[in-house]
Amino acid sequence: MSKKSQKQLTDIFLAFLLILLMSSQSTEQKPHEVIGVFALFMVLAHQILNLWWYKNALKIQKNPLNLTLNFINLALIISFILSVFSGLSMSKYATPFLNGIIKISTAREFHLCLTHWFFVFAGLHIGFHALKLATYANKSKIANFAFVASWLISIYGFWLFLDTGMVDYMLAKVQFAFLDFKIPLYQSMIINAIMLFSWAFIGFLIANFIKNLRS
């Protein structure tokens, strides 16, 4: 398998893990922690496959598109590191030896806030990379239909994002997650997938706007 294929498979699997982790109300705490630690190792593998970015981040041509993507990548990395740190400090099963590194109440507030920021930046990150794929797509009826469908899905996704109170989590207005723990896992994952798609589509639109602005 080529390195490019490995990267693509890793990206897809990471998106799946993120959706699964954000569906924590439908999983027990122990599976959530184990999946989180597994996701940490997958992210490390992802970083190894993309070491070139760290080596060339300062050398890459300084244009608005690359600068914006670098900002999103940096924000994504920072929010991920802080999400992991706060999560591990609350762990009871996966890494109990790290439990209590910081005050549990503080860790909970940080984790609730930062995981949602990470979710948003992950979506934007996906959207910027989707622009490269879109350049290979022909302006056909299927492509036009997909674009319209993406708008409709995204509008619904943002309504879900607001309806579930995720903005309050991002602004650290609440200390506890108010979730429906009776919702089936598949339904929770579909909801989170739609919301992630919405942010990815926004990332795609921003990237496309910057690209057209340059030309």
Annotate each language-model stretch with its function.
Residues M1-S215:
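Membrane-embedded alpha-helical bundles that constitute the cytochrome b-like, heme-associated redox core
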